[in-house]
């Protein structure tokens, strides 16, 4: 962080802010040039990154301006130090969880001679799945607290994850309408939407991020957070729709409307302010809508999805240009001359991020694309699954293909794809183990596909 003091025409006593951050006491280094140009009465071209600084008023909480800024700076460094251990620990946890889930697959369990332990492991993975899917939201909720070391966030995230995950499991495990994973997904997505409506306080110092700085945008959603929100929303909507997706057009339209609302909160400049995330969210919503239709997802629907997504993006950019005036909105609205340099920077950032975790990134991309292609191949187990459980199958296909769109249209798209996958792994595992012998009533709902016996 760099301290900055402004005085003279247009400035009063108090904290500085800009439309780049919309946070009292926080501005970007890129705000310096447009501020100077505005001070001397020169117009600010759309290709200029940053926004004009202005006075935001006194520091909140009765603090002096200096004390408030020092507290922000301290929390920034503490959060940055705590981020990697927390995120890496969770990724390792999901990796171990995934390996245990794969070991329960009939083919692998036979190879591992898992006849004795397979059913017991599947029963255990039921509640563990709910706990794992509840964890990511805690990385945002911890931002509501001030702490001085990495101990508090680890304890908070762990206790929250266990309390919410196990609480949802025991509360909804025998509910024939609302399973525990759906309950967690709906709750988590709702918390994130409500937080955006009230200014995005949880986005200031989130633990979730793909680097020491990514995520600390101070205003709007990072790509990692957007992927998490989209994953929660898709699986929550799919779980609520359930069997209603079969032959009931009204349920599909209601699901699309819910996902459209989530997409708007992601893209609108006064809320999520993530245009690349908006593109991915709209595309994912449309893929889910078409994939759950009676006709299924056909190739000819791809141009329709592209056209609708383009139209929706143009509309959100127009709304931003009229009412909010974020930098990204100005750049896109300014035409190719202003937008191309911004997209060029995004591509370079994306390539750099993929290179930093090359093997894991390429492996994840390859597996996600392979899954999407496999799900649409005829004469596979998916052919019957599309008919018996369109909500679950359509959601999985939408997340897989939508995460590829997220990868292509965001500078840190690999982070957005990653968080969508992190939400999906425990969700899919829960659906898989729901047929385990001895599982709760909810885990044996009609329409689920029991795993093969050894």
Where are the regions a protein language model picked out?
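Soluble extramembrane regions of membrane proteins in the secretory/endomembrane system
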Residues: 1-81
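Core alpha-helical transmembrane segments of integral membrane proteins
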Residues: 70-213, 225-236
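Short aromatic-rich membrane-water interface segments that cap or initiate transmembrane helices
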Residues: 76-87, 210-230, 270, 336-360
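Hydrophobic cores of alpha-helical transmembrane segments in multi-pass inner/ER membrane proteins
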Residues: 92-101, 156-175, 221-242, 280-297, ...
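Membrane-interface helix caps and helix-loop-helix hairpins in membrane proteins
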Residues: 144-151, 266-275, 408-415
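Membrane-interfacial entry segments at the cytosolic side of transmembrane helices
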Residues: 175-183, 247-253, 294-308
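Long, compositionally biased intrinsically disordered regions
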Residues: 230, 254, 299-320, 324-454
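Hydrophobic alpha-helical segments of polytopic membrane proteins
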Residues: 258-261, 276-315, 425-426
């Amino acid at each position: 962080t760099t301290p900055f003091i402004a005085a003279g025409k247009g400035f009063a006593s108090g904290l500085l802010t800009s439309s780049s951050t919309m946070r009292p006491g926080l501005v970007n280094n890129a705000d310096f040039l447009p501020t100077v140009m505005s001070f001397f009465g020169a117009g600010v071209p759309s290709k200029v990154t940053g926004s004009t600084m202005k006075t935001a008023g006194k520091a909140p909480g009765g603090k002096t301006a200096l004390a408030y800024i020092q507290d922000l700076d301290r929390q920034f460094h503490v959060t940055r130090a705590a981020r990697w251990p927390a995120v890496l620990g969770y990724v390792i946890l999901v990796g171990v969880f995934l390996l245990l889930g794969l070991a329960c697959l009939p083919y692998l369990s036979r190879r591992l001679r898992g006849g004795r332990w397979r059913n017991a492991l599947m029963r255990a993975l039921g509640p563990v799945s709910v706990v794992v899917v509840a964890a990511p939201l805690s990385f945002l909720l911890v931002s509501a607290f001030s702490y001085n070391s990495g101990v508090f966030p680890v304890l908070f995230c762990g206790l929250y994850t266990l309390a919410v995950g196990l609480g949802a499991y025991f509360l909804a495990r025998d509910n024939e309408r609302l399973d525990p994973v759906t309950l967690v997904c709906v709750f988590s997505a709702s918390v994130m939407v409500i937080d955006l409506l009230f200014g995005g306080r949880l986005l200031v110092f989130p633990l979730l991020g793909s680097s020491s700085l990514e995520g600390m945008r101070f205003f709007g959603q990072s790509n990692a957070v957007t992927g998490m929100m989209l994953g929660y929303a898709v699986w929550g909507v799919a779980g609520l729709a359930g069997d209603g997706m079969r032959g009931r057009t009204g349920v599909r339209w209601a699901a699309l409307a819910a996902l459209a609302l989530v997409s708007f909160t992601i893209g609108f400049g006064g809320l999520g302010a993530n245009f690349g995330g908006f593109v991915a969210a709209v595309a994912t919503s449309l893929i889910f809508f078409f994939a759950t239709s009676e006709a299924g997802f056909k190739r000819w629907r791809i141009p329709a999805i592209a056209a609708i997504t383009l139209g929706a993006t143009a509309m959100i950019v127009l709304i931003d240009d009229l009412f909010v005036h974020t930098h990204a909105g100005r750049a896109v609205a300014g035409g190719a001359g202003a937008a191309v340099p911004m997209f060029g920077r995004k591509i370079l950032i994306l390539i750099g991020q993929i290179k930093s975790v090359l093997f894991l990134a390429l492996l994840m991309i390859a597996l996600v694309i392979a899954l999407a292609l496999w799900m649409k191949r005829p004469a596979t187990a998916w052919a019957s699954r599309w008919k018996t459980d369109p909500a679950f199958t359509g959601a999985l296909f939408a997340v897989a293909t939508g995460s590829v769109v997220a990868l292509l249209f965001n500078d840190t798209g690999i982070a957005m794809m990653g968080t969508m996958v992190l939400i999906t792994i425990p969700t899919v595992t829960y659906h898989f183990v729901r047929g385990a012998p001895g599982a709760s009533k909810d885990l044996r709902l009609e329409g689920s596909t029991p795993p093969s016996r050894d």
